[in-house]
A protein has these predicted regions:
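Glycine-rich beta-strand-turn "strand-cap" elements at beta-sheet edges
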Residues: 2, 40-50, 77-102
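Active-site-flanking beta-strand signature of metal-NTP-handling nucleotidyl enzymes
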Residues: 2-8
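Short hydrophobic/aromatic beta-strand micro-patches
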Residues: 9, 42, 55-57
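Short, surface-exposed ligand-recognition loops at beta-strand->loop->(often short) alpha-helix junctions
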Residues: 9-22
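Non-catalytic surface loops within mature trypsin-like serine protease
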Residues: 10-12, 60, 96-99
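An amphipathic, aromatic/His-enriched active-site/gating alpha helix that lines ligand/cofactor pockets
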Residues: 24, 28-36, 57-93
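Short, glycine- and small/hydrophobic-rich beta-strand elements in well-ordered beta-sheets
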Residues: 27-53
Length: 102
């Protein structure tokens, strides 16, 4: 299994709305892609912003290509991201999941 991690920062007052939007875009699109297994959204407060992390889980790298395109290291961003004053990471990180107990 492969974990795909993407991060972005936004103003704290945008957190609730951005997470709702993230469900409507990134989570919706990934979860409807063959090979998708699960997703987690994490957040942590920074000094004046909040950092949101989306981790999606996939059966293999080929499934991620179906969602992300040939260059799976490039983050898939959405046209309305700017509404949330988002500071997105342009690239994602992939991990091999060795073990998962939950």
């Amino acid at each position: 299994m492969i974990a795909r991690e993407w991060k972005a920062r936004c103003p704290k007052e945008q957190k609730k709305d951005f997470i709702k939007y993230l469900y409507q875009t990134g989570v919706k699109d990934t979860s409807s892609t063959k090979g998708f297994k699960d997703a987690q959204i994490l957040s942590r407060d920074l000094e004046d912003k909040v950092e949101i992390t989306l981790i999606t889980y996939w059966d293999c790298l080929e499934s991620i290509k179906t969602y992300a395109g040939d260059d799976i290291e490039v983050a898939r961003l959405y046209p309305e991201d700017f509404r949330y004053e988002l500071e997105p990471d342009d690239f994602v990180i992939h991990y091999e999941v060795i073990n998962s107990i939950f």
